[in-house]
C-alpha cells in the first residue's frame, strides 16, 4: 500500500516537472485565442496533418504547398501526421480548434510518455541513482526544446522511440530466458518505427548499436554475435516487417540533407540553427547537461576499471559507443544534441554506480545543474530586451496570420515570401508558396532570395512569372536582405528590392500593386499583364 502511494507520488511529481518545463512557453503559443507554433518546420508538419484530416488515409508523398509549382518530395513521413490527427479526433468534442491544439500538445505528451517509460524501466533495472537521469530528462533545456509546447516536429517522436529502443537493448543484455526475446521484440519494433519516422539520426544510432552488439558478442550465442543471436530473431522479424510496411506506404526513400553538396545548400545550412556547428568550448554544453558532462570521461574510465569483467561492464560500453559518437555528431550539427543529452542522461545512473556515497552523488548533482537552472531563470524571468523581443515576435505572428487569412480562396493564388515565413503563410492561407523551410525547397529558396536582392526589374518579373506568383509578402528589409545575401553568398546590393517593398511602397515596380499592410508586413498583388 505504502509502496503504491510512493510510486503514485513519484509519477505525479515527475509528470508535473516534465509538463511544467515543456509548457513554459505557453504565452508564445497561445496568443489572443489563437495557436502559434514555434518554427517554420512545425507549420509544414501541420499542413501535412491538415491534408490528412481533409482526406483520411492519405499518405503525403508530395508537397505542393512549397517550392511551387514543382513542389517537393519530402523527407517527412506519415507516423507523426497520423499521431497528430488521432489526438485531434480525441479533442474534437471539446474544442473547435482540435487540429491546432493536437499539434501544440503532441510533443509534450510524447515527452510525458518517455518520462513514464524511463521511470518504469529505471525502477525495473534497480538503478541506485535513477532520479539523476529522470531529473535531467525533465529539465535539460535541449530535451525540453525538442518536445516543447507548439513544436509538432518529428524529433519528439524520434526521441521517444530511440529511448525505448536503447533501453530495450540494455534490458535484453540483463535479461534471461523468455524475457530476452520479449525485449528483442520491443527493441526491433522501436527501431523500426524510429527509422520510419526519420531515417537519419535513428538509422545511424541503430547501425552503431548493431556494430556494438556484433563486437561484444552475446552471452547466449558467443560465436555468432549478439546481433544475430536466436533470441533476436523475433525482434528482427518485427523490424523488417515495419520497414517493409514503411516502404510500401511511403513509396519513396527520403533524401538525406548530408548528401547535398550544392553551394546553395551549404550557404543556406549556415543560416539554420540546428545545422550549425557546436564548439567543444561552447558553454551551451553546460546549459544542456550541467557540470557532469565535464566528468564523463573520468566516470566512464572509473566504471570500466572498477569491475572490468562482470556483467555490469556492458553498460559502460553502451555509454562509450553511443555517448562519444553523438557528442562528435553534435559538434558537427547541433540537431544531434537532442540524442547526445538523451543518451548521456540514460548512461548517468550506470556511470555513477561505482560511487558508493549517495550523499556525495546528490550534492555533486545539485551543484552540477546550476548552469541548467540559470538557463531556466533567464527563460522564466527574461530581461527587458528579451521580453520585448518575445512580445514583438508574438505581435508579428498575429499580424502575419491576419494577412495570410485574407488570401484564403478556392482558387490557387501562389505567394512569394521570405522562406522562413512561407510555411506559416501556406498553413493559414491554404495557398502554395515559392519557398519553404526544408532542403527539398532549395530552388524556391534561391529564387525568393534573388527576388528580394534584385536591383533591376527584369529578374524579379521573370521569377514571378516562372512561379506563377499572385502575391508577395514584404518583411523587415534588413533581415531579409542579410539572409538572402547569406543564402546566395553575395554582397548586399545598395538598393535591393526588399528595401523598396518594405520602406517605400509607392516606389515599388509597376507590376507590384500595394494591397495591404500591418506594422511589420506589407502585401503586394501581382498586376495582370494584358
What kind of feature is each model-predicted range?
Residues 113, 370-530:
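Extracytoplasmic
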Residues 240-241, 346, 352-380:
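Signature aromatic-anchored transmembrane alpha helix within multi-pass, membrane-resident enzymes
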Residues 1-3, 125, 170-185, 214-230, ...:
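Membrane-interface junctions at the ends of membrane-embedded or membrane-associated helices
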Residues 158, 181-185, 189-306:
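Transmembrane catalytic cores of multi-pass membrane glycosyltransferases
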Residues 1-29, 131, 232-238, 358-364:
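Start-transfer (signal-anchor) and selected internal transmembrane alpha helices
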Residues 18-21, 106-121, 129-173, 180-213, ...:
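Membrane-embedded helix bundles of polyisoprenyl
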Residues 237-242, 297-300, 305-331, 344-347:
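Transmembrane alpha-helix segments characteristic
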Residues 24-124, 132-136, 140-161:
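Active-site lumenal/periplasmic loops and adjacent helix-entry segments of GT-C-fold
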Amino acid at each position: 500500500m505504502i509502496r503504491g502511494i510512493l510510486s503514485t507520488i513519484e509519477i505525479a511529481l515527475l509528470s508535473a516537472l516534465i509538463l511544467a518545463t515543456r509548457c513554459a512557453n505557453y504565452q508564445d503559443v497561445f496568443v489572443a485565442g489563437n495557436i502559434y507554433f514555434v518554427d517554420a518546420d512545425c507549420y509544414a508538419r501541420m499542413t501535412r496533418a491538415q491534408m490528412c484530416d481533409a482526406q483520411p488515409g492519405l499518405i503525403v508523398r508530395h508537397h505542393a504547398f512549397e517550392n511551387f509549382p514543382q513542389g517537393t518530395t519530402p523527407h517527412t513521413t506519415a507516423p507523426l501526421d497520423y499521431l497528430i490527427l488521432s489526438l485531434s479526433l480525441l479533442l474534437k468534442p471539446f474544442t473547435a480548434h482540435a487540429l491546432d491544439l493536437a499539434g501544440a500538445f503532441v510533443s509534450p505528451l510524447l515527452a510525458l510518455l518517455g518520462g513514464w517509460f524511463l521511470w518504469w524501466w529505471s525502477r525495473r533495472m534497480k538503478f541506485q541513482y535513477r532520479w539523476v537521469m529522470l531529473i535531467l530528462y525533465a529539465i535539460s533545456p535541449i530535451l525540453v526544446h525538442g518536445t516543447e509546447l507548439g513544436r509538432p516536429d518529428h524529433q519528439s517522436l524520434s526521441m521517444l522511440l530511440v529511448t525505448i529502443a536503447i533501453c530495450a537493448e540494455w534490458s535484453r543484455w540483463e535479461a534471461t530466458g523468455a524475457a530476452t526475446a520479449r525485449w528483442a521484440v520491443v527493441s526491433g519494433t522501436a527501431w523500426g518505427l524510429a527509422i520510419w519516422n526519420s531515417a537519419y539520426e535513428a538509422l545511424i544510432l541503430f547501425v552503431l548499436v548493431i556494430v556494438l552488439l556484433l563486437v561484444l558478442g552475446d552471452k547466449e550465442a558467443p560465436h555468432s554475435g549478439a546481433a544475430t543471436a536466436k533470441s533476436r530473431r523475433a525482434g528482427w522479424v518485427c523490424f523488417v516487417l515495419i520497414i517493409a510496411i514503411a516502404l510500401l506506404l511511403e513509396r519513396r526513400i527520403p533524401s538525406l540533407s548530408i548528401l547535398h553538396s550544392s553551394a546553395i545548400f551549404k550557404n543556406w545550412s549556415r543560416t539554420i540553427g540546428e545545422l550549425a556547428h557546436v564548439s567543444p568550448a561552447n558553454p551551451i554544453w553546460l546549459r544542456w547537461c550541467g557540470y557532469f558532462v565535464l566528468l564523463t570521461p573520468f566516470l566512464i574510465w572509473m566504471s570500466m576499471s572498477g569491475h572490468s569483467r562482470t556483467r555490469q561492464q556492458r553498460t559502460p560500453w553502451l555509454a562509450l559507443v553511443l555517448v562519444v559518437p553523438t557528442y562528435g555528431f553534435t559538434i558537427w550539427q547541433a540537431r544531434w544534441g537532442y540524442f547526445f543529452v538523451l543518451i548521456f542522461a540514460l548512461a548517468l545512473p550506470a556511470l555513477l554506480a561505482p560511487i558508493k556515497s549517495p550523499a556525495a552523488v546528490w550534492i555533486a548533482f545539485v551543484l552540477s545543474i546550476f548552469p541548467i537552472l540559470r538557463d531556466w531563470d533567464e527563460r522564466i524571468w527574461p530581461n527587458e530586451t528579451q521580453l520585448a523581443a518575445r512580445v514583438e515576435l508574438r505581435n508579428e505572428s498575429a499580424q502575419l496570420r491576419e494577412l495570410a487569412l485574407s488570401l484564403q480562396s478556392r482558387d490557387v493564388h501562389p505567394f512569394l515570401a521570405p522562406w522562413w515565413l512561407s510555411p506559416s503563410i501556406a498553413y493559414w492561407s491554404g495557398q502554395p508558396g515559392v519557398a519553404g523551410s526544408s532542403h527539398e525547397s532549395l530552388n524556391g529558396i534561391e529564387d525568393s532570395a534573388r527576388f528580394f536582392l534584385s536591383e533591376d526589374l527584369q529578374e524579379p518579373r521573370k521569377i514571378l512569372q516562372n512561379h506563377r506568383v499572385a502575391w508577395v509578402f514584404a518583411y523587415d528589409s534588413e533581415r531579409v536582405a542579410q539572409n538572402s545575401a547569406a543564402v546566395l553568398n553575395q554582397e548586399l546590393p545598395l538598393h535591393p528590392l526588399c528595401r523598396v517593398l518594405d520602406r517605400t511602397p509607392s516606389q515599388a515596380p509597376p507590376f507590384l500593386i500595394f494591397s495591404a499592410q500591418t506594422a511589420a508586413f506589407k502585401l503586394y498583388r501581382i498586376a495582370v499583364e494584358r
